[in-house]
Amino acid sequence: MQTGLSLACLVLLCSVLGEAALRKPKRQAGATDTNGAAKSEPAPVKTKGLKTLDRGWGEDIEWAQTYEEGLAKARENNKPLMVIHHLEDCPYSIALKKAFVADKMAQKLAQEDFIMLNLVHPVADENQSPDGHYVPRVIFIDPSLTVRSDLKGRYGNKLYAYDADDIPELITNMKKAKSFLKTEL
């Protein structure tokens, strides 16, 4: 049931993203430059409902925009990449997000020691879903771009899942990801 629901959510998400990608931005009527040619000016930004890269996971954290950017920054900065897979309307994802934001140690580690990425859509790299496409799940990648399969949550059936009550376990794994990097180099 859970796998079927997750798959249905992914299919729906993909169709919505595909439809949004096909839409073209509209030009403002009457906008011309000094030669009378139409100017392509961006539409005014609406602040209500504005989506930011943090998606509520911590506004003081610098977030990578894409998986590829996160991998490049991890390698360049010699820091581990922490990828949080979630859905914005998933109650488990929402609860984990609130707990993550409320925990000062988790926020501090994320700000100082990690390249951070949160994704609401699947990536093509199957290493990001070694045991399924469930959410929320957290995957760590070291600067050599190796997925840290040893850094798991406490569940046997969903190895990389974390609940809101699992923040101490997540922090432990964040510290392991960071300290492993230092002993390895």
From Swiss-Prot:
InterPro entries xref list: AGR/TXD, Thioredoxin-like_sf
Keyword Signal listed: yes
Xref: CDD domains: AGR
Coiled-coil residues: none
Main location: secreted
Cellular localization per UniProt: Secreted
Tissue expression per record: Expressed in the anterior of the dorsal ectoderm from late gastrula stages onwards. Becomes restricted to the cement gland anlage at the onset of neurulation (stages 13 to 14) and expressed exclusively in the cement gland from stage 18 onwards, with transient expression in the hatching gland during tailbud stages.
Inducing or repressing factors: In response to organizer-secreted signals and neural inducers.
GO BP terms: cement gland development; fibroblast growth factor receptor signaling pathway
One Gene Ontology molecular-function label: dystroglycan binding
Keywords on record: Developmental protein, Secreted, Signal
GO cellular component: endoplasmic reticulum; extracellular region
Signal peptide (UniProt feature, chain positions): 1-18
Positions of the UniProt region annotated as Disordered: 25-45
Disulfide bonds: none
Known function: Involved in cement gland formation; probably specifies dorsal ectoderm to acquire an anterior fate such as cement gland and forebrain. Signals via the FGF pathway.
The family this protein is said to belong to: Belongs to the AGR family.
Name of the protein in question: Anterior gradient protein 2
